[in-house]
Regions:
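An alpha-beta-alpha
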Residues: 16-67, 159, 168-183
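Hydrophobic alpha-helical
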Residues: 52-53, 66, 70-131, 156
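Hydrophobic alpha-helical segments within soluble ligand-binding/sensing domains
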Residues: 6-33, 76-79, 103, 128-133, ...
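Short, charged amphipathic alpha-helical "coupling" segments at sensory-output junctions
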Residues: 254-255, 259-268
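Hinge/cleft segment of the Venus flytrap/periplasmic-binding protein
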Residues: 41, 45, 57, 147, ...
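Sec-exported extracytoplasmic/periplasmic mature domains
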Residues: 20-27, 54, 58, 82-89, ...
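Alpha-helical transmembrane signal-anchor helices
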Residues: 208-258
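Loop/turn elements at helix/coil->beta-strand transitions in domains of secreted/extracellular proteins
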Residues: 2-3, 29-33, 59-65, 90-94, ...
Length: 269
């Protein structure tokens, strides 16, 4: 209870949806071998994903289920699955890896053993980008990957609601979606379009910064010109005042001179 609000992915639902996908790929009347590759089992995401997957698998008869803990990493997943393939000669029909990185490591081990075509491989994260989950699905490395939602926009909305004191849900679970070969290409295209728009926004932002700096520089130059013009105007006013003052003094001196000459002529007369 020592938190204001929580928003995050439903890891149990991710495991459950992965299990449901695996079940949909099973053939009736056949025993199956299932391998679950988890992260650190003591971690909450790993435990919740395992529980969801286990609940989806609980009513499957003749299922052999094994587990590998791979610490969320490619190298550990590759090494431990390779050991299983070599020492036990046990090839699973399905692999559910708790992230796409471990799924990729398991695929590499299967390729080395020559059994990659016999395994349906499911991961988690479904990130877009070179060599990431959506690419792996599109390239046939993974059969499916569950989206791990981050909800950035919803997080911002929730934070604003908390700050503004408006009503908000205290706990928000973000739903997942499954990416398969049928929609991976669409997601790649959407991501490419978003990336292009993001690049355009960054370009416009840089242009705006440049224009702002240019405007600021021009404004400073204009202010300097105005100051200089003001100084010139003040100096001009002083010069005009001095000139007019000089004219006035000259007139006064001329009058005084004329008066002195008149007085001198009167004395001579």
């Amino acid at each position: 209870d020592k938190y204001t609000a929580y928003i995050g992915a439903d890891n149990y639902d991710i495991g459950l949806r992965a299990g449901e996908y695996v079940k949909s790929c099973m053939k009736n009347g056949h025993s199956v071998r299932i391998l679950e590759i988890s992260g650190m089992r003591a971690s909450t995401p790993a435990e919740e994903r395992h529980n969801g997957f286990e609940d989806a698998m609980h009513n499957i008869e003749d299922a052999q289920v094994r587990y590998i803990e791979a610490d969320w990493t490619y190298d550990v997943a590759f090494r431990r699955f390779s050991q299983m393939l070599i020492s036990d000669k046990w090839v699973p029909d399905f692999i559910f890896a708790h992230n796409d990185v471990m799924a990729k490591g398991a695929y590499a081990a299967a390729v080395n053993a020559g059994c990659e075509k016999d395994i349906i491989l499911v991961g988690v994260d479904a990130l877009c980008g070179n060599g990431l989950g959506v690419d792996l699905v599109n390239d046939g490395v993974l059969d499916a990957s569950l989206v791990y939602p981050t909800g950035g926009y919803k997080v911002a909305q929730l934070a604003m609601a908390v700050l503004e004191g408006t009503p908000y849900a205290r706990e928000i679970s973000l739903s997942t979606e499954i990416v398969t070969a049928s929609n991976a290409r669409i997601m790649q295209m959407q991501h490419s379009q978003i990336s292009m728009m993001d690049d355009k926004i960054k370009t416009l932002d840089s242009l705006l910064d440049y224009r702002t700096m240019e405007y600021s520089a021009q404004r400073k130059i204009l202010m300097t010109v105005f100051v200089l013009l003001g100084l010139v105007l003040i100096l001009l006013c002083i010069a005009v005042y001095g000139f007019r003052r000089a004219l006035t003094l000259n007139k006064m001196l001329e009058i005084q001179k004329q008066q002195i000459e008149v007085q001198r002529e009167e004395k001579l007369a």
